[in-house]
Amino acid sequence: MNKNLSYTFVGLTLVAALWASCSDKKPKSGRTDTYSSGVISFASDESFSPIIEEEREVFEFTYKKAKVNPIYTNESDGMQMLLDKKTCLLITARDYKPEELQSLKDRGNNPRTIIIAYDGLALISHKTNTDSCISVKDFVRILNGEATKWSDIYPGSKRGEIALVFDNQKSSAVHYVQDSLLGGKPIANPNVTAALTSAEVVNYVAKTPNAIGIIGSNWLNDKRDTTNLTFNKDIQVMSVSKLEKATPLNSWKPYQYYIYNDNYPLIRTIYALINDPRNGLPWGFAHFLESPVGQ
């Protein structure tokens, strides 16, 4: 009887040990995150960092066991990270291209897209600039090099050459104007400059009377105004018109209301591109961004 009890005890001990060792094993990927817990890093276009920081703070406050760490980069490098499976989530201003989708599927992946928001591409100028309205047509003339001086757009202007400044040569802003406004052609203005980040674009325009900067509208709000209705006072936000001749009556600034009712003409879709086989925290954060709480 004692011998049988001994065998039973040893057997139960072995079963318990095996169960414990199996439960301690991590997945082959090394990830242990769930839909609402764990730690991940994800890539995001740098131009969306003000939005992402706000959303991240709310998400981590709501889900105490979750930590999401953004890697701010440009659109091209962020997409490469996703394709190389160095991240499972990318926040950017375009969807997958067909060849990118196929590349991921050919390797046994199941990439998905979620539309999370809409953003205005803002045109900013020096705060002393009295020429505050511009048509999409004239902006295209600046991009393609047809208009290189302020007087080409505003006859009589004495501001000289237009200094056109973007955040980054590989950014979503550059991709948007080339794809949506220039029909896939490159920017041809000889006076175009890349300032590396959106913050540097704002700083450059604030110090350069003849500049036009192109940035995401989420960078414009005055941090002192909790209603988000006051733009940064160091620069002027230009009103943009869909019509051939811009006037104060037919031109609009990139307030959220004018973006959502389609009055403002330069609108980008913000996407969450996901390639997460675990359906873990990348999915949880992406769905939070599109939810009413995230909006």
Annotate the PLM regions.
Residues 1-20:
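Sec-dependent bacterial lipoprotein signal peptides
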Residues 22-71, 75-76, 80-81, 117, ...:
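Exported/periplasmic ABC-transporter solute-binding proteins
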Residues 76-107, 223-225:
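Pocket-flanking alpha-helical
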Residues 87-89, 109-111, 232-234:
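Short alpha-helix boundary/capping motifs
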Residues 91-114, 242-252, 257-258:
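Acidic, polar ligand-binding/catalytic clefts
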Residues 120:
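Conserved catalytic core of two-component sensor histidine kinases, primarily the HATPase_c ATP-binding
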